[in-house]
Amino acid sequence: MATKHVQSDALNLRSAPTIADNIVATIDKGHLVNTLAPVDAQGWVNVDTNVNGTVKRGFVKDHLLRDPASTAKERLMAGAVAEWVRFDRGRGQEHIAPFFGFVGEMWRAIGIDLDGRDRDQPWSAAFISFIARGAAPDYTGFKFAAAHARYIHDAIIKREAGSAAPFWGFRLHEHRVGLGDLVCQWRETEQTYDGAKVSDAFFSHCDVVVEVASGSVRALGGNVGHTVGFKTYALNAEGFLKAENNVFAVLRNNV
């Protein structure tokens, strides 16, 4: 009847619409499911989904599903979730095998010979560049870089000029953050949208939004607690990001 994606971090697919010893499979955040019938009075919905190449059928709670975003946004978010899973759901530390090698893959994708054992080199921008490259072709216009400031500045300049780009930069009150957007924080020295418009050399951090809820969004980023991890960002009553915890801009996903 409809295509949905898993909203929760993980979701148990059950053989019957009850919470019992009946788990068919556990599927991760963003996983695609097809609903097969209307939601019942208890909130269960019958679905099928592909799990490791095999179609599984069962029941899940409908409120743990969400409507799909664009294909390009789903690819970007899926890349972020895949890295979170690869980093043992946020438990794998950057300097420990095999995780330091995964960080190395991100660095090499932007032409830099480092890995997670180079702990004085923040790799969060390499993470964003890595998942954007993996979500191509729609992100080929992304400013791949080892520093967030480079692509933040680029997104603001492109928006101001009205130029086509996968991301446009906005002030917090100008755009209600959505799935696949990037939340921007300054580090060490306070930054503003207007400052980022004239400079691409400042300390910063970005995470990709993978969940939108009432009053907050959750986003995944690299080098969050020395792993791939979640952050929660608060929204105001109008649905805009609050200017707290160093948040100063949002990059809208245009694709």
Residue ranges, per PLM feature:
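Short beta-strand/loop turn elements enriched in aromatics
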Residues: M1-S8, A125-A161
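Aromatic- and glycine-rich peptidoglycan recognition patches
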Residues: H5, D9-S15, D21, P38, ...
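N-terminal capping segments
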Residues: R66-F142
